[in-house]
């Protein structure tokens, strides 16, 4: 890169429009959409689509809801010509859809293009010639008058041919190519001359397409150019003002939105921004931007994954995983704080309420996406993501402090592996950490009975070092009695700081899950035990026994050579 880029590049001159009005406008309705996937998008592929893939793309565009589709450049190849003929002769064009074709401003190409449309009910014939100074000077070696003459003569020729083919309802579209780099007064002069040659009416309008063939400036400059033309074009009521932004500077979406605010009636582009160089404006993003503001875009992306896969297959180009609304990762949060916010948002979001969700601008379900991949866990993730995956995938709604405890265990896993932890990975780790049967104390069975004074008596059978022990205890309730019974085999008293229980699923046959937070003298902090069983009391006992096992492991790590179990009962094994 140059140390002083001003020696090679110059800024785009601002547009003199001090009374511009577009900044105070808002988008309130969708523009007319025109898909050029089959023409502009197709010509930019490593391997242009064959007839079968073009037909698949055309039918999908119709299904999405496009009413104007640029189908081909018929004079450029026999493949394109034949495709247009198949659309017409094969009856593939619905009554409410108009196909458009492109041609350069040359008589032989115009005549062949018009012939390709013979028999069509309606058609848009799109003619272009470059108007910017650099093209006039460098490419065509002509002056302003020469460029204008080409545009006017083409319009007159097409009008003459159209009058000889009255079975088709014709719409004329003219594009001053490289409008974004053309002097505004000259672009206006050419367009007004074409208007006079075609003679449109409010009932049969002409389309002036003003392309940012190369995106040269910030989107506000393009908006100024469009508003200037919108104000100054003659017979504006007989004109549809169209824009065709390219994405050379990465701001085509913003340029299109501001252009509509500035007076544009119509937007041309491609699905997912396909097209020459950096691509055309992305019509999916534009449409879903409107949708996210409560505006019907007139295009249906209810199954956007299917649209993406069809486009990938037809174009052989992948959709980027970060592509707005569509990419595999756009509804995914790895960050712990993001995950926690999303989890809380889902907890309070009502089904029919206005969508107010942290980090998710639209409901993924509206575009056919699931919630399965919203929360994904890597080394940067926190408790919210882990909790969401366990709850959404396995029905495990952990208490908040257990979320904190278990997330550190997951963090160790992802740090060690250096990869994402899937929901299945997390569930396996949860089972290994809280539900496995091995440990210093193994639950065997219990019998619970209520005494005359209302207290509870428990007879608990546990396995320690391959020997069964019977422990008995009395307490105010089953958990209190259980703690008293365990005192017979423990060297230090255990206390239950917190306990929760709930059903895993719905119905009478649903298993119960219990969470017990335990602490003991000589053991730092507290630990959780979890139990799952068809019987709620058994689940709670398993949770407490599991928690005691984890306390014993922590005690052994903090005080090597000592055990939480009474002398003579401690097994040699330690709980990891």
From Swiss-Prot:
Pathway: Amino-acid biosynthesis; L-leucine biosynthesis; L-leucine from 3-methyl-2-oxobutanoate: step 1/4. SUPFAM superfamilies: 2-isopropylmalate synthase LeuA, allosteric (dimerisation) domain, Aldolase, post-HMGL domain-like. It is found in: Cytoplasm. Catalyzes the condensation of the acetyl group of acetyl-CoA with 3-methyl-2-oxobutanoate (2-ketoisovalerate) to form 3-carboxy-3-hydroxy-4-methylpentanoate (2-isopropylmalate). Pfam families: HMGL-like, IPMS_D2, LeuA_dimer. InterPro entries: 2-isopropylmalate_synth_dimer, AIPM/Hcit_synth_CS, Aldolase_TIM, IPM_Synthase, LeuA-like_post-cat, LeuA_allosteric_dom_sf, LeuA_N_DRE-TIM, PYR_CT. It comes from Ralstonia nicotianae (strain ATCC BAA-1114 / GMI1000) (Ralstonia solanacearum). PANTHER family: 2-ISOPROPYLMALATE SYNTHASE (PTHR46911:SF1), PTHR46911. GO terms for biological process: L-leucine biosynthetic process. This is 2-isopropylmalate synthase. Its EC number is 2.3.3.13. Belongs to the alpha-IPM synthase/homocitrate synthase family. LeuA type 2 subfamily. It is an enzyme of class 2 (transferase). It comes from the Bacteria.
